[in-house]
Amino acid sequence: MKSKYLAPLISASLTGFMLIVALLAMFSPTLGWFATNKSVSASGLSVTSVGIPKTEQEIIDGGEDIFAEMMPGERRSVTLRVKNLSGKPIIFRLHMSAPTEASDSVYVEDGLWHYFGTQVRLNSVKIGDSDTDSLILEGADKYLLPLEDSQYTGGLPPTALEFDSGDGYDFSSLSESQLTDAINLAIGEEITLTLEFEFVDNGEVQNAYISFADHSSGDAVKASLNLSRTLICYFDFAE
């Protein structure tokens, strides 16, 4: 007899709980994001080098999936290992590849152009166990797809952009970004660099970024979206 009445009671309790969550989501932008969105999925980081051949560089933590399934406000780090095998003291500078139409594809909805790179900021680059930030980028240039400083109201990114031309973001004038000044490496020396990225939470519901790498509706794929960058180590012999 008890089970006869217990099942309806549990069902009613669950229904009531789900109703409360739905009502809270409607009136809370941040909670609304987590209640109504899945996650952002995107590509990640790779690494290459230019200059002296006898060096090693590899991503040892993070990397390919660093931007996958991020949520607003979430921070993630990637660690790069660099070693000097040249037999001479060297210097290197860390750069990041420029945004392109291939690396920063767009999702268009109701005339608004959504680029995930405008939401992701490189907060810092730290060497080894140091707390010192070696990142030389400032302001809007810290975002993976930079806009004008004025477009980041209060330092927060927009949720969407509307371009008068109807052609989306103009990538033609962008070049790769230098992330650090020259870093010295003695013979045989090995160091690590840790880069911290943040999906900046601007307090708005960001529904355009649902399953960013495979934004689909039913069987019809609306867009195959992407966010990726290459870290570039420029090596040279120290004078």
Predicted region positions:
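Terminal low-complexity, poorly structured segments
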Residues: 2-5, 131, 170, 175, ...
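Extended amphipathic alpha-helical interaction segments
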Residues: 152-172
